[in-house]
Amino acid sequence: MFTGSIVALITPMDEKGNVCRASLKKLIDYHVANGTSAIVSVGTTGESATLSHDEHADVVMMTLELADGRIPVIAGTGANATSEAISLTQRFNDSGIAGCLTVTPYYNRPTQEGLFQHFKAIAEHTDLPQILYNVPSRTGCDMLPETVGRLSKIKNIVGIKEATGNLSRVHLIKELVNEDFALLSGDDATAMDFMQLGGHGVISVTTNVAARDMADMCRLAAEGKFDDARIINRRLMPLHHKLFVEPNPVPVKWACKELGLVATDTLRLPMTPITDAGRDIVGSALKHAGLL
């Protein structure tokens, strides 16, 4: 089962917007050293929307190579066309990745039956473990617990990243899935409470810059030491929120650069650099967390 603090890793780039291998290695080494449970490569935070399919696959494979078996790598493989999601997923069938994170189709807003058929078709074309990803604030599409329950009966659909921030979803989904189905928060600000209600971990933006703290918080929560976990979470709470003061991954890329984890905070259009006001806000949150 996928558990603990899983990082939604940024994709570091050089000043020309090309993927920076040296910075990627530095990031991976940082997460290995600080107890991160797994890496999600080229998800939303990894700027999947501005990478070509070939670049997307190249970054995942580079991440897998640089990880060198030290930490599991999960590939982001979502698309809003089922055939495209299948094609992207199949690129990794024999790669050695730990699984795939597949977002609900965005913009075209399928019905619940459409969502079921979409994920069922992907699962039928691969043996890789599949983690569903529900983030309606970005996709315009909300996968309901009943649909998750139906999909959980498919052998290689093994978990969900639930990013609504609606904590009632934990109980509703738990009632419909088996105990081995991984319930992962996709919302850092509510992840601690999500785990207290029975979740197994978080796929996190904050972990990019606070890997040890997030790993410790998740470990303590898993051990039932919620008072201790909450002490860490309280210190990180401004960061959980302020990393979204501008569109993700703009603030977290800047924060990674500020902490010396990457060489630049270069983004690809239509994403633009963090504003001066954004720097002040995120910098203050980093200081509150004890990271600066």
UniProtKB/Swiss-Prot annotation:
GO terms, biological process: diaminopimelate biosynthetic process; lysine biosynthetic process via diaminopimelate
Catalytic activity as recorded in UniProt: L-aspartate 4-semialdehyde + pyruvate = (2S,4S)-4-hydroxy-2,3,4,5-tetrahydrodipicolinate + H2O + H(+)
Subcellular localization, as worded in the UniProt entry: Cytoplasm
Pathways involved: Amino-acid biosynthesis; L-lysine biosynthesis via DAP pathway; (S)-tetrahydrodipicolinate from L-aspartate: step 3/4
Active site, renumbered: 133, 161
GO annotations of cellular component type: cytosol
One matching Pfam family: DHDPS
Binding site for pyruvate: 45, 203
Chief subcellular location: cytoplasm
Entry keyword set: Amino-acid biosynthesis, Cytoplasm, Diaminopimelate biosynthesis, Lyase, Lysine biosynthesis, Schiff base
InterPro entries: Aldolase_TIM (IPR013785), DapA (IPR005263), DapA-like (IPR002220), Schiff_base-form_aldolases_AS (IPR020625), Schiff_base-form_aldolases_CS (IPR020624)
One term of GO molecular function: 4-hydroxy-tetrahydrodipicolinate synthase activity
Protein role: Catalyzes the condensation of (S)-aspartate-beta-semialdehyde [(S)-ASA] and pyruvate to 4-hydroxy-tetrahydrodipicolinate (HTPA).
Quaternary structure and partners: Homotetramer; dimer of dimers.
Family: Belongs to the DapA family.
Name this protein carries in UniProt: 4-hydroxy-tetrahydrodipicolinate synthase
